[in-house]
């Protein structure tokens, strides 16, 4: 008989097959260009087509992707970036990497995503962006958040790392 403390709920399960192993082995044996080889361009093109975007840039992590986005927009000291109160640490770390300040906003109870109704009270003259995060494949009310960012001339940077494959009103997230 198992005790409750012996029960484990898996956070994820990795599925691979022989083709996956062969492709990875081929890349490793090539000995160079692991991160910039032709497979990366093929992957970026596939993602662009899948989500319906004009651009795709592969980085090593979601943290790096957020950090690069914040740098590209020129966020820095004294700027405020609204983030969900329930998020992965990358959202806050990337904000701090550019010396901006994270401003935590409430989440929706049904998606655990950023609650659009809580954003307005968090906006100040220092606010530069809103960063909703898709959690566990569920997207927040992104259309309402987009409207708020447009009305307040703020950047909308979607952290859709956990939402790849999800869609809202027929449009892929991210």
Model feature map: region roles:
Residues 10-13, 60, 131-133:
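Short beta-strand segments
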Residues 32-80, 94-98, 104-106, 171:
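Phosphate-binding glycine-rich loop
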Residues 71-163, 167:
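PLP-dependent aminotransferase-like
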């Amino acid at each position: 008989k198992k005790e409750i403390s012996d029960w484990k709920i898996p956070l994820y399960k990795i599925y691979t097959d022989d083709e996956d192993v062969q492709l990875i082995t081929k890349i490793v044996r090539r000995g160079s260009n692991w991160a910039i080889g032709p497979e990366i361009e093929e992957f970026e093109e596939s993602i662009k087509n899948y989500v319906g975007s004009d651009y795709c840039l592969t980085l090593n992590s979601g943290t790096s992707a957020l950090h690069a986005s914040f740098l590209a927009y020129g966020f820095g000291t004294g700027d405020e970036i609204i983030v969900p109160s329930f998020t992965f640490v990358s959202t806050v770390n990337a904000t701090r990497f550019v010396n901006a300040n994270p401003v935590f906003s409430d989440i929706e109870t049904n998606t655990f995503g950023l609650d659009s109704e809580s954003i307005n009270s968090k906006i100040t003259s220092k606010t530069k962006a809103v960063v909703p995060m898709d959690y566990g494949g569920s997207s927040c009310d992104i259309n309402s958040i987009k409207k708020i960012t447009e009305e307040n001339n703020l950047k909308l940077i979607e952290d859709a790392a956990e939402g790849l494959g999800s869609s809202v009103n027929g449009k892929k997230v991210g």
